Amino acid sequence: MAFDYKKEYKALYQPPCTPHLITVPSMTFAAVRGQGDPNDPAGEYKAAVELLYGLLYTIKMSKKGSYRMEGYFDFVVPPLEGLWEQTGAEKENFRWTSLLRLPEFVTRKEFDWAVREATAKKKKDFSRVEFFTYDEGLCVQCMHLGSYDDEPETLARMNAFAAEQGYAVDFSETRFHHELYLSDPNRTAPEKRKTILRHPLKSSL
């Protein structure tokens, strides 16, 4: 049976709808950085997501080819994630990093092979996809149910909870507003979408 990160790491992928603290371990991702409106069907964001899934499925399906990855195990491709820089409300100015978690057996060597393999087989340039390590640390987290545009209400509850616990949001050049998308927006009504929200924290004392 394929390893499913959502089921094996429920604290990370199936949190409650109430704000809570969590320490997120260091993980490696396939990542694409960009700027622009994520809702633009012809925009940079959509292209980035297609690259990420193309690379992850190249890794997943390597079991059917001649290349052998040491320690390989079959896996369910984890949920799409996004790191968002706080640059105002205009969506065309959003700066983001789109992410898909990599299985632990994917080293830099295996990642570089997958980039070359995907580029050759799919006739598309995958060189924009980065091998990215993110050590998120202490965060406040909450499951948001509903439209992406309604996130501010959930974020306000999260930040208020963090303040009650003696913490403040800690955005920086290396720590960001973080979203994990458990619902396909093309197949799920806005009011039924599930999105995990995370904010990095520091002590306010």
Language model features with spans:
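A solvent-exposed interaction/effector surface
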Residues: M1-L205
